[in-house]
């Protein structure tokens, strides 16, 4: 589970030429279990001595890591070793999975100022592991970790300020937090901060800075940023116009499953914008984006006017994608139906 805060910036309907996609400030992708989101430093907390416990952890030697970290935590009161022990217990690596013991080690490390432990406890509190769910407590722990420079905590806390439920909505403070995470190389934060610059929310409107941030996130395979960067490249907005590179980024995002990119790529291929027109591939991507919920009447009309052979080929090429999308939608609907009432 991750934070569910989502800030949507309304955009226009898709047209026959690439437009701005629906922009979202979204949580990072994937689950946010502490093992995935809590970086544990590879050096000791009291010097530059290599951390053998963390080295063993990285190599998958979890029992060895547990023994070394335990010794270091007890002998040196090293907070990073305590956090590593929390990781091992939280995820059942080398020891039986035990949220209670994980939380105990995280608390000891957090009390000694380790931001990774603070963030891990924030996720525990958010998910109700080793205690009741408490978003307020989670937010406070994230704030504590963010103050110490934890990039993912800064990113998640920024989303809470954008959401405006636990805290008063504050785009300016959100931008400051996103900058911490973006400067640390977090692509979701780079994309989110770029969106704020593009919209002029919490920061002066600056398309060049927005595109710069989109480009950084796009290079790190953030699909939404790839779409934004591709649109900027295609239109020459905030960056030199380069339609061929734009098409490459649209295609990359489309292949990753982004329906906006799929729809824009279909438009480009249907009209031959910057590339040779390819009606069959255009129809394929339109069928895929339509299955994912994208509305585009001009493209639908384009597909309907294809000759039967070309349309059949497009349908055959799109079918694996469409089937996968439909299975995912059905599974999500089933999960919503099975969820207990709040």
How does the language model describe each region?
Residues 49-56, 68-72, 82-91, 118-127, ...:
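Hydrophobic face of amphipathic alpha-helices that form TPR/SEL1-like repeat modules
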Residues 8-83, 330, 342:
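N-terminal leader/linker segments that initiate helical-solenoid repeat arrays
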Residues 44-45, 49, 57, 61, ...:
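Short helix-capping/linker turns of helical repeat alpha-solenoids
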Residues 72, 109, 145, 181, ...:
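Alpha-helical solenoid scaffolds that mediate protein-protein interactions
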Residues 20, 25-28, 40, 290-342:
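Terminal, low-structured helical/coil segments at or just beyond the last alpha-helical repeat
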Residues 1-6:
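Bacterial N-terminal signal peptides
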């Amino acid at each position: 589970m991750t934070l569910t805060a989502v800030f949507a910036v309304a955009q226009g309907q898709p047209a026959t030429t690439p437009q701005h996609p629906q922009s979202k400030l979204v949580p990072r992708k994937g689950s946010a279990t502490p093992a995935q989101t809590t970086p544990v430093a590879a050096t000791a907390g009291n010097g530059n001595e290599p951390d053998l416990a963390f080295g063993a952890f990285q190599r998958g030697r979890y029992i060895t890591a547990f023994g070394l970290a335990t010794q270091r935590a007890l002998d040196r009161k090293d907070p990073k070793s305590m956090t590593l022990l929390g990781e091992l217990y939280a995820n059942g690596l080398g020891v039986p999975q035990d949220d209670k013991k994980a939380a105990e080690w995280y608390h000891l490390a957090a009390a000694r100022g380790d931001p990774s432990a603070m963030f891990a406890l924030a996720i525990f509190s958010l998910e109700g592991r080793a205690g009741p769910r408490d978003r307020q407590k989670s937010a406070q722990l994230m704030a504590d970790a963010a103050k110490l420079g934890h990039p993912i905590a800064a990113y998640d806390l920024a989303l809470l300020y954008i959401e405006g439920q636990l805290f008063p909505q504050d785009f300016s403070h959100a931008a400051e937090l996103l900058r911490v995470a973006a400067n640390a190389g977090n692509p979701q934060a780079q994309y989110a901060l770029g969106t704020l610059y593009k919209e002029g929310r919490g920061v002066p409107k600056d398309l060049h800075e927005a595109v710069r941030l989109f480009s950084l996130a796009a290079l790190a395979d953030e699909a939404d940023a790839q779409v934004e960067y591709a649109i900027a490249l295609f239109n020459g907005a905030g960056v030199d116009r380069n339609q061929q590179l734009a098409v490459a980024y649209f295609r990359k995002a489309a292949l990753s499953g982004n329906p906006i990119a799929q729809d824009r790529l279909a438009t480009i291929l249907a009209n031959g914008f910057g590339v040779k027109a390819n009606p069959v591939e255009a129809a394929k991507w339109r069928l895929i984006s339509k299955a994912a919920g994208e509305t585009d009447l001009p493209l639908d009309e384009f597909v309907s006017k294809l000759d039967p052979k070309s349309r059949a080929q497009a349908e055959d090429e799109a079918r694996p994608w469409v089937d996968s999308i439909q299975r995912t939608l059905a599974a999500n609907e089933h999960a919503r139906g099975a969820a207990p009432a709040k």
